[in-house]
């Protein structure tokens, strides 16, 4: 697949590594990756979309080839939304786009999908395994009071969030992973042995932990009411071992034009079932 690459400077002087794929005259898809991935994780899906769309991907700050901020607060959700704005203003200036995001890419993209300034440009948002932290906080409070079983079920899936708050544990642990070792873990989760290697896994894992530290406690303790400014599709992965599908049940509270589609897949379906994910993206946008 042909691609072009760019460097985009952010509002706080970081550098983001951006790629574009396909014919620039086609409708635009912006794909945002999660943790501990980089933009390469989207390539299997891109192969099924590139004939029909102009695709923009980028390494979020701290991942892949992009620069690594020194301070945790540089990973806060409002700054991540500004990063998306910097990318689209640079690569597709004044054009509208469809946003698709997975895992932490989706969590951070909710900040933009509920931001009024994107209303005229963001045509739709497809979220995969990444809830809005504000919505999740309201949901967990309600579940704790009314449905403790659901509350503790999600809590058991989110054990790693607490571990990532420890100052040195998570960065140190990632030093012991190699690309092949991480690939074996993904293969066990997804039931496939042909998944691509992430050659940046040590750095992506080590630095991306700041996403959790900068955002989870502030958002879960002081959630904001955030309403979507565009149609939203939630691709719900029924076998997801990290995000409970029940988190999606309350989404119509926050999204006026909402669509839900269930897929029998685990968390990294964008790698293990790219053709299915691409089909659902096409169907929605």
Regions found by a protein language model. Give the residues of each.
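Hydrophobic "lid"/C-terminal helical patch
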Residues: 84, 88, 277, 281, ...
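Residue-level recognition of beta-strand->loop/alpha-helix junctions
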Residues: 59, 262-264
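Conserved HGGG/HGGXW glycine-rich cap/lid loop of the alpha/beta-hydrolase fold
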Residues: 19-65
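Hydrophobic residues on the short alpha-helix immediately C-terminal to a glycine-rich phosphate/catalytic loop
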Residues: 45, 112, 247, 280-284
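N-terminal cap/lid segment of alpha/beta-hydrolase-fold proteins
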Residues: 1-15
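Catalytic histidine-centered segment of alpha/beta-hydrolase-like enzymes
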Residues: 265-278
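The conserved beta1-alpha1 loop
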Residues: 30-34, 102, 236
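Flexible "cap/lid" subdomain of the alpha/beta-hydrolase fold that forms the substrate-access gate
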Residues: 14-16, 41, 56, 63-100, ...
């Amino acid at each position: 697949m042909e691609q072009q690459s760019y460097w985009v400077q952010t509002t706080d002087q970081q550098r983001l590594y951006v790629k574009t794929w396909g014919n620039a005259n086609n409708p635009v898809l912006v794909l945002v990756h999660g943790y501990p991935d980089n933009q390469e994780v989207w390539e299997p899906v891109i192969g099924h979309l590139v004939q029909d769309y102009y695709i923009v991907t980028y390494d979020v700050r701290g991942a892949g080839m992009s620069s690594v901020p020194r301070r945790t607060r540089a990973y806060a959700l409002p700054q991540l939304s500004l990063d998306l704005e910097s990318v689209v203003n640079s690569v597709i200036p004044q054009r509208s786009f469809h946003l698709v995001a997975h895992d932490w890419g989706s969590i951070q993209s909710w900040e933009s999908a509920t931001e009024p300034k994107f209303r005229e440009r963001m045509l739709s948002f497809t979220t995969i395994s990444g809830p809005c932290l504000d919505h999740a906080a309201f949901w967990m409070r309600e579940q704790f009071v009314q449905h403790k079983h659901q509350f503790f079920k999600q809590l058991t899936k989110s054990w790693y969030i607490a571990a990532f708050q420890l100052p040195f544990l998570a960065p140190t642990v990632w030093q012991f992973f190699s690309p092949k070792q991480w690939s074996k873990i993904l293969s066990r989760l997804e039931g496939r042995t042909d998944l691509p290697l992430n050659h940046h896994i040590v750095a992506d894992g080590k630095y991306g932990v700041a996403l959790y530290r900068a955002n989870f406690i502030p958002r879960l303790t002081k959630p904001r009411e955030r309403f979507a400014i565009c149609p939203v599709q939630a691709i719900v992965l029924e076998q997801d071992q990290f995000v409970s599908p029940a988190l999606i049940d309350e989404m119509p509270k926050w999204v006026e034009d909402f669509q839900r589609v269930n897929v029998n897949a685990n968390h990294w379906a964008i790698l293990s079932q790219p053709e299915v994910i691409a089909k659902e993206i096409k169907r929605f946008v």
